[in-house]
């Protein structure tokens, strides 16, 4: 395994260990501003077509986010990740992939889930944690 592919997998495994403290669940969590230093987000409220979560770390931290596996119905639903708020730059709309990792440029990252009405929702799980300055991973 090349070093370039080993790093995302190592990050995913270490993230899964770190996030046991704060799991975001329940339909009332959609639209929440999350200030936990680590946790996970999943689409537990499958009735909503559109949902956003904003992760806010301490001012001196960046947000590290990892999606171990994503298998949404492409063309019918997607997850979009923003560096900062919804008005910030988008990393793109994602519907499938594995070992997907993002690092914010500041202390905020926003996740948007969007689904075309009338289509069923696919499950997903996203891990996040705060990264201090100077740490590579």
Swiss-Prot record:
Residues in CUB domain copies:
30-131
Keywords, ordered alphabetically: Disulfide bond, Glycoprotein, Secreted, Signal
- Using the UniProt annotation, give the residues that carry a glycan (glycosylation sites): 119
CDD domains, alphabetically? CUB
What name does the UniProt record give this protein?
A: Major seminal plasma glycoprotein PSP-II
Query: What are the cysteine partners in each disulfide bond?
Result: 30-51, 74-95
**Which source organism does the UniProt entry give?**
Sus scrofa
Compartments, as annotated in UniProt: Secreted
Q: How does it assemble?
A: Monomer or heterodimer with PSP-I (depending on the type of glycosylation of PSP-I).
Q: Which family does it belong to?
A: Belongs to the spermadhesin family.
